[in-house]
Amino acid sequence: MFVTKRIGPKSKDLGKIKKLYEEAFPENERFSFSMMIKNESGHYETFGFYKDGAFCGFAIVLNSLDISHIIYFATLPEMRGKGLGAKALAAMGRIESGRRIIVDIEREVPDCEENEIRRRRKNFYLRNGYSETEVRYRWQDEAYEILVFGGKLSKEDFGNFWKNLGINKNTSEG
């Protein structure tokens, strides 16, 4: 059975989540793990995913206005390719019902050796009900695009999401 749990700062699984977070995301793409888990701003939510009682992945979501932005999403390497990512996204859709859910993915760029994995990642989200948007931006010298579930998303919506959090996000094509 697949289960999704909200994770708080005293969860027994924080060590597993932090380990996967550090393994799955390069250091230059990571925020302060403790800041997100403590959630003093009230904008972060952390979810753990479990298959038959065993931890298999997590998502960290940043909420603003009517948008839930999955900023980190990972499953254990040995659990990939088993449909658990799709189950996790479906669970997120139920939990965040009535809100638009967005993800950012690295865009394909000419002569990039990671284009195949970027294409597969994008197709994974599209197969799971996400749609393309007009939103493109650059961060840490990387080109990103936004996909959305549960509605549409404009550049203005994306800018307002960040503005509401007190952050000025440049959505130029870059």
What is each of the regions a protein language model found here?
Residues 96-117:
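Conserved GNAT acetyl-CoA-binding A-motif
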Residues 75, 81-95, 118:
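Conserved acetyl-CoA-binding loop-helix of GNAT-fold acetyltransferases
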Residues 1-31, 144, 156-164, 171-174:
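Short amphipathic alpha-helix that is part of the acyltransferase structural core
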Residues 66, 139-143:
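Short acidic/glycine-enriched loop/turn segments that link adjacent beta-strands
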